[in-house]
């Protein structure tokens, strides 16, 4: 979230997973309890940042609508909402990346939760796409992220044909079907 009159510079991005590990290590508690504390502290920091008119960002799977109220509060306080939405084009790839993360010491997530979160993230994205002032959407399925879509105000620009889940989120956000024309035709 960025105050409308600010320029974008350094933005504190809160990563819940890294914060939970830090809490677990420094407060000598299990990771499950540390995750809960991280979520509670992040929510408090985000609202405190809005109250202090301080730009802040948060990384989220977007599998719940919990940040909607924060966005509404920030907008009511003059913030411009900027969103980066990064997805993988298939939940199988999400499952594989979690396996790799676990193999390198990261935390596990049950496969059924990964798959359910993939679907819910697109469902929730529709609301944030509609409400955000600026949105950049990237597909991170390959070796390099690819920009798929941008939104500036009410204008959407597609750089590639969206996957069905993204197309449905856009349709849900704006209430109409998309027609895609290849730019090379």
Task: Cite the ranges covered by each PLM segment.
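A generic structural signal for alpha->beta connector loops
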Residues: 10, 78-80, 131-132
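Conserved nucleotide-binding/hydrolysis micro-motifs of P-loop NTPases
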Residues: 18-20, 63, 87-93, 142-144
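Short, surface-exposed amphipathic charged segments that create phosphate/polyanion-binding patches used
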Residues: 28-29, 96-100, 149-154
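Conserved substrate/cofactor phosphate-moiety recognition/catalytic segment
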Residues: 2-54
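Residue-level signal for well-ordered alpha-helical positions
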Residues: 26, 70-73, 97
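A glycine- and Lys/Arg-enriched "phosphate-lid" helix/loop adjacent to the NTP-binding pocket
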Residues: 77-125
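NTP-dependent small-molecule kinase module
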Residues: 129-185
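Glycine-rich phosphate-binding loop used to anchor ATP phosphates in small-molecule kinases
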Residues: 34-88, 121, 136
């Amino acid at each position: 979230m960025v105050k409308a009159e600010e320029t974008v510079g350094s933005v504190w991005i809160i990563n819940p997973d890294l914060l939970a590990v830090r809490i677990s290590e420094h407060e000598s508690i299990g990771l499950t309890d540390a995750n809960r504390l991280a979520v509670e502290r992040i929510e408090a920091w985000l609202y405190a940042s809005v109250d202090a008119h301080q730009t802040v960002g948060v990384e989220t799977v977007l599998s719940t609508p919990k940040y909607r109220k924060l966005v509404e509060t920030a907008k009511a306080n003059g913030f411009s909402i900027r969103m980066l939405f990064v997805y993988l084009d298939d939940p199988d790839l999400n499952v594989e990346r979690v396996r790799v993360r676990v193999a390198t010491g990261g935390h596990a997530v049950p496969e059924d939760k990964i798959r359910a979160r993939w679907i819910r993230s697109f469902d929730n994205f529709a609301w944030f796409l509609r409400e955000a002032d600026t949105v950049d959407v990237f597909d991170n399925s390959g070796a390099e992220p690819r920009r798929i879509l941008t939104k500036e105000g009410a204008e959407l620009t597609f750089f590639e044909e969206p996957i069905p889940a993204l197309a449905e989120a856009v349709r849900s956000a704006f209430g109409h079907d998309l027609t895609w024309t290849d730019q090379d035709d």
